């Protein structure tokens, strides 16, 4: 049973950690949107679209079995390694802006990682099923543990499963930073973007990478909160 210092399901001082995480994520999201909007107005001198740039980058890397698809949404661009599909959003696919080409090159970076069996990408892909399971069941276990009178075993099992999300987000960081590094190098070497345009693409990709840093920081703060609330408690 829980005792001493338990604040219940309502407000407690550790919520400040959650609020800090939310603010960090909101600031990162606002920055990537404003940075993308700024460089989305800057047209590349080459005049090619992001989709054309993606095809050129993939072929230049000797990759011909990745399909480039147009999907709905803004900044929903992604690379799907299970189906070997590079998805470019409405804001990216037909755009010839520095921002759009930078984003497309970043996703190509993931495709190249996949082709080269880049270890962090493979590790991230391997743990996805376990992480998804943990994310689904962690909070229900914590809540059930509280409802049952403060079962330390159930609650800490929930906390352990939640920690898998933190691990996933930490593994994601080198994957994203490496993809951006590859993208910028390729854009320069292939002359898809000129030197002055590379600077804009770098700012867009850096802002995007910071959203992953913010998400990881937010999850770490949430995990810290759970450990502060429940880590020192025991079942009777």
Language model features: what each stretch is:
Residues 1-8, 30-134, 167-223, 228-236:
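Polar-ligand-bearing catalytic/cofactor-coordination segments
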Residues 2, 145-160, 229-236:
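Membrane-interfacial helix-loop-helix connectors in multipass membrane proteins
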Residues 6-35, 145, 152, 157-159, ...:
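Hydrophobic alpha-helical transmembrane segments of small proteolipidic membrane proteins, enriched
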Residues 18, 132-135, 139, 159-162:
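Residues within membrane-spanning alpha-helices of integral membrane proteins
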Residues 128-151:
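Post-HExxH zinc-binding segment in Zn-dependent metallohydrolases
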């Amino acid at each position: 049973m829980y005792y001493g210092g338990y604040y219940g399901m309502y407000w407690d001082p550790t919520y400040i950690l959650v609020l800090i995480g939310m603010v960090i994520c909101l600031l990162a999201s606002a920055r990537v949107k404003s940075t993308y909007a700024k460089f989305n107005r800057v047209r590349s001198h080459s005049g090619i679209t992001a989709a054309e740039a993606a095809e050129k980058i993939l072929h230049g890397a000797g990759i011909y079995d990745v399909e480039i698809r147009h999907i709905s949404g803004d900044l929903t661009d992604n690379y799907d390694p299970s189906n070997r599909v590079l998805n470019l959003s409405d804001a990216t696919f037909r755009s010839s802006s520095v921002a759009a080409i930078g984003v497309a090159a970043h996703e190509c970076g993931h495709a190249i990682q996949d082709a080269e069996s880049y270890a962090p990408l493979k590790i991230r892909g391997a743990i996805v099923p376990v992480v998804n399971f943990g994310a689904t069941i962690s909070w229900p276990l914590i809540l059930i543990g509280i409802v049952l009178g403060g079962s330390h075993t159930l609650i800490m099992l929930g906390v352990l499963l939640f920690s898998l999300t933190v691990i996933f987000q930490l593994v994601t960081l080198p994957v994203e930073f490496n993809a951006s590094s590859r993208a910028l190098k390729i854009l320069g070497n292939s002359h898809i973007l000129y030197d002055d345009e590379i600077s804009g693409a770098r700012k867009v990709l850096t802002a995007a990478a910071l959203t992953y840093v913010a998400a990881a920081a937010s999850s770490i703060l949430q995990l810290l909160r759970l450990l502060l609330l429940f880590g020192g408690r025991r079942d009777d």
